[in-house]
Amino acid sequence: MCVFFGECNKVCEHSILAGMDMKEETRLLVIARRNAIPNDERIARSEKACEELEQYFSRTVASGARIAAYHAMGSEVDIAPFAKSAHMHGWTCAFPVMMRDDNDAKDRMTFWDVPLDGTRRAFFDKPARAVTPDDPSLAGCTPCNPREIDAVIVPMVAFDAGNMRLGYGGGNYDRFLRELRSDAVVCGIAFREQEVEAVPTEPHDLALPKIIVA
């Protein structure tokens, strides 16, 4: 089994883990490639991607819009520069929170408005974990109805030329994107090292309308 990477440098990498499914294999290989990007380069390329993201939303999203952003984990594209400057366009940024549901075996991804003050720092200082609505880390934050979100920035593990996306396996964004209004602007963001020849897909998977490549 092999996966091909890059547009100019498509190198076949053979799995050494017997019995691993194609999606898991792709995740491990691509995350390793993303982790190998030097930190200084990752920061510079993230900043450039944020500039492109800001230009794109300036053309497609109205002032006063609410944008579902994210806080970068590990070696993901860091969109913090975009989140910090969004208010200059009149945009509000919401961030994902895994919400614990006692009536459901699975935690649910929700989005919350996080103010541009010490609240945001305290919010991000908490490790990724499932919480309940009364968790102290959410003090000063406001939950968002998916129908009130005007645009979404989608992180990912891998993508291909057809804009198919591979996530981390929880299905959180797959479910969330289906809850949005039909006119919501959806934009993925990733490093070029995350491109593969073909993302392993299932019949229900949908391509993203746009992906900004850093």
Locate predicted features.
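Surface-exposed, charge/polar-rich loops and edge strands
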Residues: 4-21, 25, 32-39, 139-152, ...
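N-terminal active-site beta-alpha-beta segment that forms phosphate/nucleotide-binding
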Residues: 16-147
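Short, structured patches in soluble enzyme cores that scaffold and shape functional sites
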Residues: 71, 97, 113, 156, ...
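Short glycine-rich anion-binding loops that position phosphate/pyrophosphate groups of nucleotides
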Residues: 73-75, 157-161
